[in-house]
């Protein structure tokens, strides 16, 4: 089996952090988002090769993947952002077996091992949502096979959202579908992989729909903090190495080595990077990078990059790397 991981996007909804860090490498609960997905891939044990479709800050993604995951891999640049079908099309030279396609700006609770015994042409994983208008949604028949997939419907034809996780056993028909889609007029400059799946269905393919237990978005600032909270609650809590006088920790938290906390309350739902200092402050529901210094502040719902200095500030904020903000506490 081959694995395709498209991660060429610029992460505009996560700026300023994605100016310097690729979206899949932003951390929640002390780990890069893509690491949660790759853990599931490693557990499968029958992966022949991973094809990373790279783009923005591609060198950082490539260096991280090579250093962290001992799987045969290739890296293909998507120089033009022409959509998800365009991204997967770049992997064509390497597709000669069933493929698992994973978009890594979300974290999911799914048993990927079911692909080993699947006899369907493919599997698509979904999650029932109320705000269906934001997603591609899937319609099924009475046997649980997909009959239609529609991007961001205006009418409630389904509430089963496509989460960006697919297994395609009939890889030949997938490539045929992508080739067909690329001959059609693009939608605002992009071709969608979901249209290739619809092509497969129209040609008689059986694509099974499987619901996931949990689906956590890390693709925008508003949801990344909530995903951090969920991952901490699911057992990622880690206590700091150095607790100073007057320090209070409210679980769950993930505080890396070398942090100093004095006369401060940290938590709940805080991830604090290595070497950070928190003094005379309170912080909750916050993701902070490495070597962050927070003094005389009251912070909540913040996303702070590396080497950020916050002094005398109250409230919520998003601050990129190597920035300082000071005010009256």
Question: For each predicted feature, which ranges?
Answer:
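Left-handed beta-helix
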Residues: 180-329
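Short internal beta-strands
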Residues: 51-55, 126, 287, 303
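Conserved N-terminal catalytic core of the sugar/cofactor nucleotidyltransferase
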Residues: 2-5, 13, 26-27, 31-103, ...
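Active-site metal-binding loops of divalent metal-dependent hydrolases
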Residues: 10, 105-106
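A structural signal for short hydrophobic beta-strand segments in well-ordered beta-sheet cores
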Residues: 25, 138-140, 209
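Conserved core of the sugar-phosphate nucleotidyltransferase
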Residues: 108-183
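Conserved beta-strand segments of alpha/beta enzyme cores
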Residues: 24, 72-74, 145, 206-208
